[in-house]
From Swiss-Prot:
Induction of the gene: The compound guanosine 5'-diphosphate 3'-diphosphate (ppGpp) is essential for the transcription of the bacABCDE operon and GTP regulates the transcription of both this operon and ywfH via the CodY-mediated regulation system.
Protein residues bound to ATP: 138, 178, 184-185, 226-229, 268
Gene: bacD
Positions of Mg(2+) 2 binding: 311, 324
Keyword Endoplasmic reticulum among UniProt keywords: no
Annotated protein name in UniProt: Alanine--anticapsin ligase
Quaternary structure, from the entry: Monomer or homodimer.
Domain (ATP-grasp) ranges: 142-355
Coiled coil regions in record: none
Cofactor details (free text): Binds 2 Mg(2+) ions per monomer.
Amino acid sequence: MERKTVLVIADLGGCPPHMFYKSAAEKYNLVSFIPRPFAITASHAALIEKYSVAVIKDKDYFKSLADFEHPDSIYWAHEDHNKPEEEVVEQIVKVAEMFGADAITTNNELFIAPMAKACERLGLRGAGVQAAENARDKNKMRDAFNKAGVKSIKNKRVTTLEDFRAALEEIGTPLILKPTYLASSIGVTLITDTETAEDEFNRVNDYLKSINVPKAVTFEAPFIAEEFLQGEYGDWYQTEGYSDYISIEGIMADGEYFPIAIHDKTPQIGFTETSHITPSILDEEAKKKIVEAAKKANEGLGLQNCATHTEIKLMKNREPGLIESAARFAGWNMIPNIKKVFGLDMAQLLLDVLCFGKDADLPDGLLDQEPYYVADCHLYPQHFKQNGQIPETAEDLVIEAIDIPDGLLKGDTEIVSFSAAAPGTSVDLTLFEAFNSIAAFELKGSNSQDVAESIRQIQQHAKLTAKYVLPV
């Protein structure tokens, strides 16, 4: 069979480049379009070059030789991308037509809506224009969820301080204030005290002005205020060590939801995730409830052909509470870990769906559990504050070393990989925690509880050597 051509809108996020490009290129010819060259790391650029038959970069972002250089790491691209949505759509269409693309995909949350519009114009399978907008704008998302037969929660659009005051009056506390257009829990804030609520709103609103997003990202209101979803851990798990929420990965094919795998989590720092354990140890009844909720949510958004990453709160009486869902792959190493544990290559499966619809080899339910577990974990400054190594008043630190002492792992759990910020790395402790991962590690073991306890031990006992900047 002749290899089909897939246009990849290359940017940050989703399935990591170290898996995506090799997996995709094994079956498809890849054309990579880079709308934000400044958002590509050196290793990402090398993989794009290695596995693409052609690479197109937006020429408007090359003003000097320095613009051809790529940094070693990026969490969030802070340079401006000032092209409106329609111009981005036209760029995608032009490149797709130039190479006769049979499908278009991206791993980046911020280009989901322009890509959907380009797919529609070209007659290619995609998420669907309205569905993509529903999945990108969290106000529209919550409206769709509330109509989809899942737990309905109070919510209100927020643009101004007056809107926030009205939301606070209507919803009460605890209340979640969430940016409608971002990802990675950036800016998500729990409001519990009415006395300080307005100060919190102003703080988050001011901070978000410093976070650049492409001009093509559109929304009706910058915030959504929602009632807090209260978890009930003991109704779902029979052992300690996990969190009261999970994520479930799936695929939409011609408007039908296909669940793939559920990830357990370890306790968060605020709303910042700390680790994902693949697969989940939840019992079959619990998994069935989660799958039913995810199906209603994603089909309720109207999604047609795309990957889905759905986050669900585990509430009282085993009621799933929809947090949000994205029309893209999960980030971190969750997609590679599904392949490690189950042998399913979701990167290839998505492209199969985009090219062939339901003729792709889709699973008929959650993948069966294999005899081992893989955990994808990060360490943040807050872990070292909690274990007393970073002074609570510190505003900055310069890392000298991060080490994991011997004797922390439980059962047959082993460290597969470990990486830490390089010596001399400066960390601004005033940033949202999600920006400040300072170490990452992967664990593997035959017992999920041993893996979870090993994570907890590492969080409590990892050794940080650093210099601190304290307020005068």
